[in-house]
Amino acid sequence: MKMPLNIGLVHFIGIGGIGMSGIAEVLHNLGYKVQGSDQSDSANVQRLREKGIEVFVGHKAENLGDAEVIVVSTAIKKNNPELVAAREKLLPVVRRAEMLAELMRFRRAVAIGGTHGKTTTTSLVAALLDAGHLDPTVINGGIINAYGTNARMGDGDWMVVEADESDGTFLKLPADIAVVTNIDPEHLDHYGNFDAVRAAFRQFVENVPFYGFGVMCLDHPEVQALVSRIEDRRIITYGSNPQAEVRFVNQRMDGAASLFDVVIRSRKGEATEIKDLRLPMPGLHNVSNATAAIAVAHELGISSDDIRRGLGSFGGVKRRFTHTGSWNGVEIFDDYGHHPVEIRAVLKAAREATSQAGGRVVAIVQPHRYTRLASLFDEFAACFNDADTVIVAPVYTAGEEPIEGVNSEELVSRIKTAGHRDARYATGPEALAPLVASIAQAGDFVVCLGAGNVTQWAYALPKELAEQGKK
């Protein structure tokens, strides 16, 4: 049964969050009455207001007004005054993933899961379905540059969504196609141990109906192991692995773009080859994400020409190797990477892109959360090999209390003892421009990494460097 239109006013607590804002926007576009509140007047909040959605800044009980349904994310605490008031009124309270699941019932759905690469892969699947004239509805975990938003209402039969595994609620999503990019030990604060993460991803894939299928990366050992455990569901494998059904080969760089070929082999022995595909993003990880999207698109009957066109015109995702400006031939980028696996992949991509011109890579990292840094300290210490210089800023706490012995100064020390030749500590954003100006030369890439407010530093840095040169 589809959700009826007469459910009354829907109030989102934390509507400015990247996941919540997309759902609110699509609900609004479907004709539902939507409003919400958020702690800050962010770009997402302003975008929703421009679409006619009322948003209150700050959380107060009176914000509920005549709301009849409340939507919350896991970030909302039980003592939130709006949530307390809603429960006193005995209003139905819906988790973000439950509301996303309701929206998915309106369409056939592709859900993109995995520890890393979800947002980019979701955007790539959307781009290829767009190129194939399927006009999908999209709800993503990042701003898709081509849309200027993280959500889009399409007229076609398909919906493409990012499936967030962080709190286990992705298992509620009714997907026809489930994509798994990789599986790493992340979000153990929720799952308790890695075996529980593995079990969740198995259920995610086995939840697809018998007429659906899973798309799984054979290059990742955990995913390959999971493929062998999936029962009674069709699986399409992808990657550079010679055994993959959709395999990328001959990957090479063209400036900051990737060129590659794809060989698609059916189980009946038929082979299709698409040569000289161009993706306007660097990095093996992005070629892998593109190959996942190609696997979905090909299975849905999208032609090789449309796949080529969709990839070639892909505009990227905000905060995924986003170019923020230049200074004296130095290029500055912003990236959301905040896990060692993501950081390593981004820096490897930057290294590939600069190597043709002999440039160097300068990484500016803002560790995100003390708990993540503590649980992955050794991995963080060893993930910067492709950066010539590493500049570590103070930890972005995200509201967490400090942990003794777990801080950015200690990380710099450990990076050095792990063999890195040039790791430095920066006291804060004000220290970055002088430091970068003393290090970077024409042809270098400066890559700002993290899930906190380092993105603001990345956009401010080109101007600050220009002003530095005037001193």
Swiss-Prot record:
Cytoplasm among keywords = yes
Q: Which GO terms describe its molecular function?
A: ATP binding; UDP-N-acetylmuramate-L-alanine ligase activity
Sorted alphabetically, which keywords does the UniProt record give? ATP-binding, Cell cycle, Cell division, Cell shape, Cell wall biogenesis/degradation, Cytoplasm, Ligase, Nucleotide-binding, Peptidoglycan synthesis
Principal location listed in the UniProt entry: cytoplasm
Q: Where does the record locate the signal sequence feature?
A: none
What InterPro entries does the entry give?
A: Mur-like_cat_sf, Mur_ligase_C, Mur_ligase_C_dom_sf, Mur_ligase_cen, Mur_ligase_N, MurCDEF_pg_biosynth, UDP-N-AcMur_Ala_ligase_MurC
A single GO BP term for this record reads: peptidoglycan biosynthetic process
Question: Which principal EC class is assigned to this enzyme?
Answer: ligase
Write out the similarity annotation.
Answer: Belongs to the MurCDEF family.
Described purpose of this protein according to its UniProt entry: Cell wall formation.
Q: Write down what this protein is called.
A: UDP-N-acetylmuramate--L-alanine ligase
Annotated organism of origin: Brucella canis (strain ATCC 23365 / NCTC 10854 / RM-666)
Q: Which gene encodes it?
A: murC
